[in-house]
Amino acid sequence: MSFPEGKDILFMGNEAAKLAEAFQKSLRKPSHKRSQSIIGEKVNTVSETLELPTISRPTKPTILSEPKLAWTDKGGAIKTEAKQTIKVMDPIEEEEFTEKRVLPSSDGKTPAEKKLKPSTNTKKKVSFTPNEPGKYTKLEKDALDLLSDNEEEDAESSILTFEERDTSSLSIEARLESIEEKLSMILGLLRTLNIATAGPTAARDGIRDAMIGIREELIADIIKEAKGKAAEMMEEEMNQRTKIGNGSVKLTEKAKELNKIVEDESTSGESEEEEELKDTQENNQEDDIYQLIM
């Protein structure tokens, strides 16, 4: 069974729209009279009962010819109509005129092509007025809307067209998806290996060797890809390090002196606090012993 092509469907839609418009126009005419009943029987109309009057054919109008003059002036006939004067151009002017008309200008178009400007308003395939109430149903409107698209917009508005998504992105999600796909392939191979072990010995060994080889190749590809990405990241890190430096901060001489002073004060403060803590601990121990003795 062969289905109609797109152009055939458009042609049929155009023809149906034209027939519908013609039928609507015929219904609007006041002179439209029914010559048949709903069942299909013939109905006698007034125009059929009355005899049409005979109309005589129109006669050709007689043209009166002007009387010829009996005498002539200087041996020649008098001319009633003046001849149109024809301008005779020189051959040089003719060449210049043709060059101007044929040779293209700076934009690459001849004057004749400039006169013929292409019409920017592209006509729709089917024209209809949706504002008229009761003329079209919703289904007819949808069909006419689909058929009335411009030819240039058919590719964008067609329901059958679709855009293939570009999967060549270098994002982390795309890499993870590719790794997941390869791992799912490996799992599928392992399952087929388990199923193949139930067969004959020779076939089982051959299938097992082939599947193991494919599995090793896939694992090697994954490791190679991971190493390549790691090498790229390390190289990028080295490039950044050469630009920024090793990140160490060096103190000036004054900063070193201030640092020593701060360190000395912090150590001396810590030693005093430690001595105070020791004294308080000893006092607490003596109090505890005194309480036990009492």
From Swiss-Prot:
Subcellular location per the Swiss-Prot or TrEMBL entry: Virion; Host cytoplasm
Coiled coil: none
Mod. after translation: Constitutively phosphorylated by host.
Region (Binding to the N-RNA complex): 281-294
Pfam families the record matches: Pneumo_phosprot (PF02478)
Annotated stretches, region: Binding to monomeric RNA-free nucleoprotein: 12-28
Residues annotated as signal peptide: none
Region named Disordered: 97-136, 260-294
Region (Binding to protein M2-1): 135-157
Residues carrying Phosphoserine: 106, 148, 157-158, 168, 171
One Gene Ontology cellular component: host cell cytoplasm
Self-association and partners: Homotetramer. Interacts with protein M2-1; the interaction between the two tetramers is required for the anti-termination and elongation transcriptional activities of protein M2-1. Interacts with host phosphatase PP1; this interaction recruits PP1 to the inclusion bodies. Formation of a complex PP1/M2-1/P allows P to target host PP1 phosphatase to the M2-1 substrate. Interacts with the nucleoprotein N; the phosphorylated phosphoprotein P binds to N-RNA complex. Interacts with the monomeric RNA-free nucleoprotein N.
MF terms (GO), sorted A to Z: RNA-directed RNA polymerase activity
Ranges of compositional bias, category Acidic residues: 264-277, 284-294
Protein known as: Phosphoprotein
Region: Binding to RNA-directed RNA polymerase L, residue numbers: 251-279
Annotated segments matching region Oligomerization and binding to RNA-directed RNA polymerase L: 169-194
Record region (Binding to host phosphatase PP1): 123-128
Main localization (coarse): virion
Function comment: Plays critical roles in regulating RNA replication and transcription through its interactions with multiple proteins. Tethers the RNA-directed RNA polymerase L to the nucleoprotein-RNA complex. Recruits the M2-1 protein, a processivity factor that is required for efficient transcription of viral RNA. Acts as a chaperone for neo-synthesized nucleoprotein by forming an N-P complex that preserves N in a monomeric and RNA-free state and prevents the association of nascent N with host cell RNAs. Recruits the host phosphatase PP1 to inclusion bodies to regulate viral transcription.
InterPro entries the UniProt entry points to: Pprotein_pneumovir
Family recorded in the similarity comment: Belongs to the pneumoviridae phosphoprotein P family.
